[in-house]
């Protein structure tokens, strides 16, 4: 799979938040987006996964513009902003409900995803009882259980303890070896230096 960001610009109320961005993402690599909050990195992730459309330019996935065709992007899953689940269901029940919609994810795969993010011991707690870090872990587990070809992760380690960060990082490195494309956006440079093959630095909508 190949993702091409071609001359992408994005404006909100005449404020230009992305300026003529060009990037190429290829199989078997981890890419990092680094920069201050509001620098444009999260906006680009949302454009790549189809939440936003670019004001100008295009994103091509294997040569196809899904933004323009308004189609669901296959084999791509994203953790964008704060994950959202049903508060009165447990972590496991939330993932099981999503798995039933997918109709191809087994209970074993759900439990494996929870194990990877160190949430297996809290799987039977209600989501409303989860801490910020636990909620973040559940969002990552959702992406993991769906086993996509492309993973977009926005501030994935926010509120997560070091032991779990290391475990999730090890998983991501294994997925890279399997040929997956992984894009991680974070303002914490140290997280990216340990994982990313290439880091893009965002500053006021431009990339260095």
Across the structure, where does each feature detected by a protein language model lie?
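Catalytic Walker B motif of ABC-type/P-loop ATPase nucleotide-binding domains
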Residues: 151-155
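Conserved ABC ATPase "signature" region
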Residues: 96, 107-122
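Conserved ABC transporter NBD signature motif
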Residues: 57-72
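The feature captures the beta-strand-to-loop junction immediately N-terminal to the Walker
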Residues: 34-36
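Helix-to-loop junction immediately C-terminal to a conserved catalytic motif
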Residues: 49
